[in-house]
Swiss-Prot record:
It comes from Paraclostridium bifermentans. InterPro entries: Bot/tetX_LC, Clostridium_toxin_transloc, ConA-like_dom_sf, Nontoxic_nonhemagglutn_C, Toxin_rcpt-bd_N. Expression of the ptox operon (ntnh-orfX1-orfX2-orfX3-pmp1) in B.thuringiensis kills Anopheles but not Aedes mosquito 3rd instar larvae. The ntnh-pmp1 construct is about half as toxic. P.bifermentans strain Cbm (subsp. malaysia) is toxic to Anopheles mosquito 3rd instar larvae and less toxic to Aedes aegypti larvae. The presence of 4 plasmids, including this one, is required to kill mosquito larvae. Residues 382-804 are annotated as: N-heavy chain nHN. The lineage of its organism: Bacteria, Bacillati, Bacillota, Clostridia, Peptostreptococcales. Gene3D superfamilies: 2.60.120.200, 2.80.10.50, Clostridium botulinum neurotoxin b, 'coiled-coil' domain, Metalloproteases ('zincins'), catalytic domain like. This is Non-toxic nonhemagglutinin. Belongs to the botulism non-toxic nonhemagglutinin family. It holds the Pfam family Peptidase_M27. SUPFAM superfamilies: Clostridium neurotoxins, 'coiled-coil' domain, Concanavalin A-like lectins/glucanases, Metalloproteases ('zincins'), catalytic domain.
Length: 1167
C-alpha cells in the first residue's frame, strides 16, 4: 500500500489530501467538531491533534489509575509533527510485512455497506470539508489521544452500524510517542496500533462484539467481598495469547450467538452485493471493486487477527496474557519514543533501533495517576500505624455475583463452532496487490446519518482504607523495599516486625537466611582490594543462589513433589511456628488460597428423545441413537470444560496472583543485593587507591555477575511457577474433580434413562434388539473420565518472566557446520547470534555423526565473538565437542583459547603429548594447568570441560567418564573485553564436531546421557569412530584379536593373520543391495566384495567356512553394531546366523557361520 511520507503538518488545506473537516459530530462542548486532517494512504486519514470528543481539562475524580493527563499535550507544532511522523512510520512498519500489507489493504477496501436511495448509492464513510462541503472517503481517522494520554481506543461513528453488518467509520485515539515495559522489554507501538486497526476492521465489517458478551476472568483481590473480573470477548479475541488459547480449547461458552450472527450478517450483505448491487450500473465502479475485495475473505479470518499472531509475524516479544489484566501485576512506567532527528531517533521502520530489550528510552516526566483500589494499613495493638500498603486492580469490569449461579449449559448448542487458531500466514484471501491498484473512491455521494453520542466520563471511586492487625503479603513485599537515600547503606533483617516498627529507613526485610547471615557485620571498608572484592562478590552470589533457588522434596501431596520453602517467609503465607512444609501438610494446598473455592455446577438438562411416528426400523433407530450418543458425550465434555473454566477463575487465578507476588519478592531481594554490590563497587572507586584500569575490570566484571544474579532469580521464578501450576491442578483433582464425577453420574443416569425409555417405546423391534441397542448406547463412567494431569498443566502455562531479564538461551554457542557445492558454512544456532569468522582455507569433512571442521595447518582458524564469552568471576560455562587427531601429537599446540595473548586472562585448551592441557589465568596472574596425557589415539573422543565458579569446581570428562575434578578457588577474574574464542590447530591435524558452549555447568549424569545420545544412533563405525561408507576399502580385525587382520588362505578362505607381513590381507568393500546411500546403518543388508578379486563372501556348505565365491552365490548379510562398543560391527544372515572366528584349527582361526550364543568373537571392526 502506498503511504504518503514526509507530511508537513503546517501546510494549508489543499482540497485533496489536506482538509479542514467539520460538521459530522459534536465535541465535548456541544459544538460541531472541526479539525485539520491529512490523508496518509487511501481512505486513511490522520489528525495531528487531540481527540475532539473528550474534555482535556478534567477533574481529579475523573482521572483513572495509571493514566497521564496533560491538556497541553500536542498543542505545539513540533509535537504535532512528531506525532504525524510517528503514525506514518508505524503504518510503514506494518506495511513492511506481508501480513501487515494485507491488513492495511483490507482496511482500505472494507468500506461500510452503501445505502441505496432512489437508484443512487450513498456512503456514510466520509469526512466533509468545512469550506466546500466536499466529501472524502475515509474508513479510519487516527487522532491523538483523548483526555488520558496513554489510553488507546477505537470509537465507532455509529455503534448500531458497527454491529448490524452495515459497518461504520472508525475514529482511533492513539498515542505513538509513549510506550511502556512488560518485564525486560519495551512494548512495540506497532502492536498497539495494530490492536486499534484490528478493532477498526470489526467496525468496518459491522461485526463489533456486543459489550455484554463477557467471560469471567479471575477473582479480584478485594478483601471485603467475593468479586470477579470479566473480560469482553472482543478484547480477548484481539489480544490473543494464552487466555484466548485457553478459552478456545473447548469453546462451549459459545452459545452466545455472536459468532453465528456475525457470519450471517456478513453472508447477508455479501449476497446482496453479489446478486443485486454488483449488477447495478448505477454503482460507482471503484466502490464496487472495493466491496468485492471486502467480501472476498472468509469472515473467520478476521477472528484470527490478534496481537500474539502479529507479534510472531514481526518477531516481537508480547505478553501472553490479556493486556488489561496485566495492569494488576505491572505498575506501568512510560518511556518516550522519538521518530525524527530533532530529539534523537530511537525507532525506525524495523522497530526499536537497539531492539526491544536494549532500547535506550528515557522515562517520561509526566505525572502518572496513582489511585489504588485499596489502602491497607497494618496497625499494632496500640493502633499505631506500622506500614501503609496499596492494592491495585486490573482495568476490567467487575461483577459481584457468580457468573455460573443461574447458568444452564445448553444441550443442543455450541457443538460445532471453534475460533480459528491460525499459526500460518494471516488473511490468506486478501490480494493486497489487486486492492492497492483500485483507485480511491473519489466521487463519493454522502449519506448523512446521525453519529452515536460519545459517552460521558465517569467518576473514579475513592480508594477504600482498611486497618488490619495481621500483616498481608503486600505488607511483606513493601518491607523488602529500601526507601532511604540512594547513597546510604542499609541493613538486611530477618525480623519483619522489627523492620516495620522502627522509624529507621536503613532497616530492610529479607527472607534469605544465608544472605542475612553473610551480611551480618558486613563492613565495606574491609573489602579494599580487587582480590578481596572478587572473593566477596562470589560468596554473595553463592549465598543468594543457595537461598533463592532452594527447593525441598515433599511426599504425600498429590501432583506436588517439590516446594519452595521461602515463600512462606516472603509473603507471610502459612506462617506459624512450624515450617512451611509442616503447615502445608497440616492444612493442605487450599490453605494457600485467600478466597474459598466456589465452583458451581451449572444447571444441566438432557433433552428428551422425540418419539418416532411412524416407528422406525432397527437400522434407522441405530442411526438416530448414534447421533444422540455423540451429542450426549459432547454434553459431558461441555460440563467438564465449564468446570475447568471455574477452576481457572476461582483457583488457578489465585495461584497466578501468588506467583506474581513471589515474583515481586524475588525482584525486591535481587534489587537489594544489586544495590549492596554497586555500593561496594562505588566505595572501591571513591575510597581506595585501586588504579583506573583495574576499576574498569571490576566494573565490567560486576555487570557480568549481576547478569548471573538475574539468571539465578529467573530459575527461582521457574520453581515458583512449577509449584503453583502443580498445586492448582492438584486442588482441581482432589477438591473439584470428585464432585464433578458425582455431578456427571446424575447427568449420565438422566441420559441413560431417556435412551432406555426411547428404545423400549419402539414396539416394532424385538427384545433382543432392544438389549443390543441399550448395551451399545448406554453411557458409562469411562465416558466422563476426562482428567489428565499433564494436559491440564499444558492448558494453562503460567511461566512468568522477571522484570529485569528474560532467560538466556541455554547455549552461549551451538555450532552448525555445513558444506555445499559452493562454500563452507559455519553458523551459530544457539539464538545468541554469535559472530563467527573463519579463514578462507577452512576445510569441512564428514565427521563422526555430522560434518566436522578439519584443521591441518597454522593459517586455519575459526573465531567466535560474543559478549557472553566475557567471563568474569561468577560466570559458569561448559565446553563440549567431539575431536579426532589424525596423527600422533608430539609438540604443544593451542586448540582452543579465550585469551588475547599469552599474558591475558582467560582459559585455554592445548594439545600436548597425545593428550590435552586445560589452563586458566586470571587478572591477578594466578594460573592453573591440568594435564590429561596419552589418551588421543586417532579415534573420536567426546570432550567436556565444565566450570562452576560458585562452587569453584572444574570437571573434565572424556568419553562420558570423569577424568578431572579440581578445586579452582585460586582463580578469580577471567574477564576479557575481547569476548572472542579462537579454534585453531597450530600444526596438528584435528577434526572438530558438535562444538557447543553452555551457559551453565553440568553434572556427571547429564554428561553420560549426552555421550550415550551421541553414540546411540543408527550409523555403524570403523575402529576410529568414523561412519562406515559404502564402496570404500576396509581391512578387518576381530574384537578378540584387534591387532590381527583377516587374510585370505589360498585366495579362497578367510582366517586371522599369523605374522605382521602377510601379503594376502583381505580388503573389502560393502555393497548395499537395496538402496543407494553413502553411510552404512544398522540393519542394512549388504554383500561383501573382495577388493583384489572379483569375488564375494559366500559360504562353504560342507565346512560352514566363509569363502570367496562369484556374484550369484554372494551371501546377503545384515549389519548391526556391538551393544557395548559402537565401533564394532556384527554380520548375520536372515536366519540369525553370525559370522565369527572358529576355535583354533591347526594354525588357523577360520571365519565361519554359527548359530550359537553371540559373544565377542562375533564382533568385527573395520579399519
Amino acid at each position: 500500500m502506498d503511504i504518503i511520507d514526509n507530511v508537513d503538518i503546517t501546510l494549508p488545506e489543499n482540497g485533496e489530501d489536506i482538509v479542514i473537516v467539520g460538521g459530522r459530530r459534536y465535541d465535548y462542548n456541544g459544538d460541531l467538531a472541526k479539525f485539520k486532517a491529512f490523508k496518509v494512504a487511501k481512505h486513511i486519514w490522520v489528525v495531528p491533534g487531540r481527540y475532539y470528543g473528550e474534555k482535556l481539562d478534567i477533574q481529579d475524580g475523573e482521572k483513572i489509575n495509571g493514566g497521564i493527563y496533560d491538556k497541553d499535550f500536542l498543542s505545539q507544532n513540533q509535537e504535532k509533527q512528531e506525532f504525524m511522523d510517528g503514525v506514518i512510520l508505524l503504518l510503514k512498519r506494518i506495511n513492511n510485512t506481508l501480513e501487515g500489507k494485507r491488513l492495511l489493504s483490507l482496511i482500505t477496501s472494507a468500506v461500510p455497506f452503501p445505502n441505496e436511495d432512489d437508484g443512487i448509492y450513498k456512503q456514510n464513510n466520509f469526512i466533509l470539508s468545512d469550506k466546500t462541503f466536499k466529501a472524502y472517503t475515509s474508513n479510519i481517522i487516527i487522532f491523538g489521544p483523548g483526555a488520558n494520554l496513554v489510553e488507546n481506543k477505537v470509537i465507532a461513528f455509529n455503534s448500531g452500524d458497527a454491529e448490524n453488518g452495515l459497518g461504520t467509520i472508525s475514529e482511533i485515539c492513539f498515542q505513538p510517542l509513549l510506550t511502556y515495559k512488560f518485564g525486560d522489554y519495551f512494548q512495540d507501538p506497532a502492536l498497539d496500533l495494530l490492536k486499534c486497526l484490528i478493532k477498526s476492521l470489526y467496525y468496518l465489517y459491522g461485526i463489533k462484539v456486543p459489550e455484554d458478551f463477557t467471560l469471567p476472568y479471575r477473582l479480584t483481590n478485594n478483601p471485603d467481598k467475593t468479586e470477579y473480573s470479566q473480560v469482553n470477548m472482543e478484547d480477548l479475541l484481539i489480544s490473543g495469547g494464552d487466555d484466548l488459547n485457553a478459552a478456545g480449547q473447548r469453546p462451549y461458552w459459545l452459545w452466545n450467538n455472536y459468532f453465528i450472527d456475525a457470519k450471517d450478517k456478513f453472508d447477508k450483505y455479501k449476497e446482496i452485493y453479489e446478486n443485486q448491487m454488483k449488477l447495478d450500473p448505477n454503482l460507482e465502479i471503484n466502490l464496487s471493486n472495493h466491496l468485492e475485495q471486502k467480501f472476498n475473505i472468509n469472515i473467520s479470518e478476521l477472528w484470527s487477527l490478534n496481537i500474539s499472531n502479529f507479534a510472531r509475524t514481526f518477531n516481537l516479544k508480547s505478553p501472553r496474557s490479556f493486556y488489561k489484566a496485566l495492569k494488576y501485576y505491572y505498575r506501568k512506567k512510560y518511556y518516550k519514543i522519538h521518530y525524527n532527528e530533532i530529539f534523537g531517533t530511537n525507532y525506525n521502520i524495523y522497530g526499536f533501533i537497539d531492539g526491544q530489550v536494549n532500547a535506550s528510552l528515557k522515562e517520561t516526566d509526566l505525572n502518572i495517576i496513582n489511585k489504588p483500589q485499596q489502602i491497607i494499613n497494618l496497625i499494632d495493638n496500640n493502633n499505631i500505624l506500622l506500614i501503609k500498603s496499596y492494592i491495585y486492580d486490573d482495568e476490567l469490569n467487575k461483577i459481584d455475583y457468580n457468573f455460573y449461579n443461574n447458568y444452564e449449559i445448553p444441550y443442543n448448542y455450541g457443538n460445532s463452532f471453534k475460533i480459528p487458531n491460525i499459526t500460518g500466514i494471516l488473511l490468506p484471501s486478501v490480494n493486497y496487490e489487486l486492492i492497492d491498484k483500485i483507485p480511491k473512491i473519489a466521487e463519493i455521494k454522502p449519506y448523512i446519518k446521525d453519529s452515536t453520542p460519545l459517552p460521558d466520563s465517569e467518576k473514579t471511586p475513592i480508594p477504600k482504607e482498611l486497618n488490619v492487625g495481621i500483616p498481608l503479603p503486600i505488607h511483606y513485599l513493601d518491607s523488602q523495599i529500601y526507601k532511604g537515600d540512594e547513597d546510604k547503606d542499609f541493613i538486611l533483617s530477618p525480623d519483619f516486625l522489627k523492620v516495620v516498627s522502627t522509624k529507621d529507613k536503613s532497616l530492610v526485610y529479607s527472607f534469605l537466611p544465608n544472605i542475612v547471615s553473610y551480611f551480618d557485620g558486613y563492613d565495606k571498608t574491609k573489602i579494599s582490594t580487587d582480590k578481596k572484592y572478587y572473593l566477596w562478590i562470589r560468596e554473595v552470589l553463592n549465598n543468594y543462589s543457595i537461598d533463592i533457588t532452594r527447593t525441598e522434596n515433599i511426599i504425600g501431596i498429590f501432583g506436588v513433589d517439590e516446594i519452595v520453602p521461602w515463600m512462606g517467609r516472603a509473603l507471610n503465607i502459612l506462617n506459624t511456628e512450624n515450617t512451611f512444609e509442616t503447615e502445608l501438610r497440616k492444612n493442605g494446598l487450599k490453605a494457600l488460597l485467600s478466597k474459598d473455592l466456589n465452583v458451581i455446577f451449572p444447571k444441566t438438562k438432557v433433552d428428551p428423545i422425540p418419539t418416532d411416528n411412524p416407528p422406525l426400523t432397527i437400522e434407522k433407530i441405530d442411526e438416530k441413537l448414534s447421533d444422540i450418543y455423540i451429542k450426549n458425550k459432547f454434553f459431558l465434555i461441555k460440563n467438564y470444560y465449564i468446570t475447568i473454566q471455574q477452576w481457572w477463575i476461582c483457583c488457578y487465578s489465585q495461584f497466578l496472583n501468588l506467583s506474581y507476588m513471589c515474583r515481586e519478592a524475588i525482584i525486591n531481594q535481587q534489587n537489594l543485593i544489586e544495590k549492596i554490590i554497586l555500593n561496594q563497587l562505588s566505595y572501591l572507586a571513591r575510597e581506595t587507591s585501586i588504579n583506573i584500569e583495574t576499576l574498569y575490570i571490576l566494573s565490567v566484571t560486576t555487570e557480568k555477575t549481576i547478569e548471573d544474579l538475574r539468571e539465578i532469580s529467573q530459575k527461582s521464578m521457574n520453581n515458583i511457577c512449577n509449584f503453583f501450576e502443580r498445586a492448582s491442578v492438584s486442588i482441581f483433582h482432589t477438591d473439584i474433580y470428585n464432585k464433578f464425577i458425582d455431578h456427571m453420574k446424575y447427568i449420565v443416569d438422566d441420559a441413560n434413562t431417556k435412551i432406555i425409555n426411547y428404545i423400549n417405546s419402539n414396539s416394532n423391534i424385538t427384545q433382543e434388539e432392544k438389549n443390543y441397542l441399550i448395551n451399545k448406547y448406554m453411557l458409562t463412567e469411562e465416558d466422563f473420565n476426562f482428567f489428565n494431569f499433564d494436559k491440564l498443566i499444558n492448558l494453562f502455562n503460567s511461566k512468568i518472566q522477571l522484570t529485569i531479564k528474560n532467560e538466556k538461551p541455554e547455549y552461549n554457542l551451538l555450532l552448525s557446520i555445513n558444506q555445499n557445492e559452493s562454500n563452507e558454512n559455519i553458523t551459530d544456532i544457539s539464538g545468541n547470534n554469535v559472530k563467527i569468522s573463519y579463514s578462507n582455507n577452512i576445510n569441512i569433512l564428514d565427521g563422526r555423526n555430522e560434518q566436522a571442521i578439519y584443521l591441518d595447518n597454522d593459517s586455519q582458524y575459526v573465531d567466535f565473538k560474543s559478549k557472553n564469552f566475557e567471563n568474569g568471576v561468577t560466570n559458569n560455562f561448559t565446553i563440549s565437542f567431539w575431536m579426532r587427531t589424525l596423527e600422533k601429537v608430539d609438540t604443544n599446540s593451542t586448540l582452543l583459547t579465550s585469551k588475547l595473548n599469552e599474558n591475558s586472562a582467560g582459559w585455554q585448551l592445548d594439545l600436548r603429548r597425545n593428550g590435552l592441557v586445560w589452563s586458566m589465568k586470571d587478572h591477578n596472574k594466578n594460573e592453573i594447568n591440568i594435564y590429561l596425557n596419552d589418551f588421543l589415539d586417532i579415534s573420536w573422543h567426546y570432550i567436556v570441560v565444565s566450570v562452576n565458579r560458585l562452587t569453584n569446581i572444574l570437571t573434565v570428562y572424556i568419553d562420558g567418564e570423569l577424568s578431572v575434578n579440581r578445586n579452582i578457588e585460586e582463580i578469580y577474574n577471567l574477564y576479557s573485553d575481547v569476548g572472542t574464542i579462537k579454534l585453531q590447530a597450530s600444526g596438528s591435524k584435528v577434526r572438530i564436531e558438535s562444538f557447543s558452549i553452555l551457559n551453565r555447568d553440568i553434572q556427571r549424569d547429564e554428561v553420560s546421557n549426552r555421550y550415550i545420545n551421541y553414540i546411540d544412533n543408527v550409523n555403524l563405525r570403523n575402529i576410529y569412530g568414523e561412519r562406515l561408507e559404502y564402496n570404500k576399502e576396509y581391512e578387518v580385525s576381530n574384537y578378540v584379536y584387534p591387532r590381527n587382520l583377516l587374510y585370505k588362505v589360498n585366495d579362497i578362505y578367510l582366517a586371522i593373520e599369523r605374522g605382521s607381513n602377510s601379503s594376502n590381507r583381505f580388503k573389502l568393500i560393502l555393497i548395499n543391495i537395496n538402496e543407494d546411500k553413502k553411510f552404512v546403518q544398522q540393519k542394512d543388508i549388504v554383500i561383501i566384495k573382495d577388493v583384489t578379486q572379483n569375488k564375494y563372501l559366500g559360504i562353504s556348505e560342507d565346512s560352514n567356512k566363509i569363502k570367496l565365491v562369484d556374484r550369484n552365490n554372494a551371501l546377503e548379510l545384515i549389519l548391526d553394531n556391538h551393544l557395548l562398543n559402537p565401533n564394532y560391527t556384527t554380520f548375520s544372515t536372515k536366519q540369525e546366523e553370525y559370522l565369527r572366528l572358529s576355535n583354533i584349527d591347526g594354525i588357523y582361526n577360520w571365519v565361519i557361520k554359527d548359530v550359537s550364543r553371540l559373544n565377542d568373537i562375533y564382533s568385527w571392526t573395520l579399519i
